[in-house]
Swiss-Prot record:
It comes from the Bacteria. SUPFAM superfamilies: Nucleotide-diphospho-sugar transferases. The record marks 164, 220 as: Positions MEP for the nucleophilic attack. Its EC number is 2.7.7.60. This is 2-C-methyl-D-erythritol 4-phosphate cytidylyltransferase. It comes from Acinetobacter baumannii (strain ACICU). Belongs to the IspD/TarI cytidylyltransferase family. IspD subfamily. The gene is ispD. Pathway: Isoprenoid biosynthesis; isopentenyl diphosphate biosynthesis via DXP pathway; isopentenyl diphosphate from 1-deoxy-D-xylulose 5-phosphate: step 2/6. It catalyses: 2-C-methyl-D-erythritol 4-phosphate + CTP + H(+) = 4-CDP-2-C-methyl-D-erythritol + diphosphate. GO terms for biological process: isopentenyl diphosphate biosynthetic process, methylerythritol 4-phosphate pathway.
């Protein structure tokens, strides 16, 4: 596999990790990104994976009261930047992009990745960035929907079966040029659109977004049980 180092010599690559969320489905009192898997927190594992790419730097958007993140042993910590997160994930990402726009070029590429996805592989990261740069368009990791999907009514009865033929399940990282993504999110927020990921903001301004095949083991830790699954995945990948 061709690696990125020669391709990105002209193009700087940054990462944004929104990590201000409370993750209410995980726990009312604990933050999932700060749970431990083996001897490191989830977010340290996540940064370690992203740091396999030739990043110029990465920005962690954290809660205003968060004093813990800066004490962690992040990979390439000299490349770490911190900014305040926002109310929702989308606001955290925008805050990080505003921070980045002071130190980066608007044509630099930025990967936005969930803090709670520590199992993304280098192969997936490499393929995603390579595809974005070679086609000069935004891109996301995603996997085709495998299961049969049912649309139900309010009584929890099946209305119909939804064709899954063209349906993909979005993952992260999602990559775009800093200036384009910043404009997309600002425009979407101004128009009161619901933004669930970076791609939905990009779609809303007519920006084409490429889907790059991900892996089913790139799980997002959402519930307490997922920690053990992530541990097993990391163990098997190593």
């Amino acid at each position: 596999m061709r690696h990125l180092h020669h391709q990105t010599s002209q193009t700087k690559l940054w990462a944004v990790i929104p990590a201000a969320g409370s993750g209410s489905r995980f726990s009312k009192t604990e933050l999932k990104q700060y749970q431990y898997i083996q001897d490191a927190t989830v977010i340290e594992h996540t940064v370690k994976r992203l740091s396999q790419l030739p990043l110029t730097g990465y920005v962690l958007a954290i809660g205003k009261q968060d004093t813990f993140a800066s004490t962690l042993s992040f990979q390439d910590k000299h490349k770490a930047h911190f900014c305040n997160g926002g109310v929702e994930r989308v606001h955290s990402v925008l805050n990080a992009l505003n921070y980045l726009s002071q130190i980066a070029d608007e044509d630099d590429w930025v990967l936005v990745h969930d803090a709670a996805r520590p199992c993304v592989t280098f192969e997936c990261l490499n393929t995603l960035v390579k595809n974005a740069i070679e086609t000069n368009q935004s891109a996301i990791l995603a996997i085709p929907v495998r299961d049969t999907l049912k649309q139900v009514n309010q009584e929890q009865q099946i209305d119909k079966t939804v064709s899954r033929e063209l349906l993909w399940q979005a993952q992260t990282p999602q990559i775009a040029k800093i200036g384009i993504l910043k404009k997309a999110i600002e425009t979407a927020l101004k128009n009161n659109l619901t933004i669930t990921d970076e791609a939905s903001a990009l779609e809303s301004i007519g920006e084409s977004v490429l889907v790059v095949m991900g892996r089913s083991d790139n799980i997002k830790i959402t519930y307490p049980d997922d920690l053990e699954l992530a541990r097993l995945i990391l163990q098997s990948q190593n």
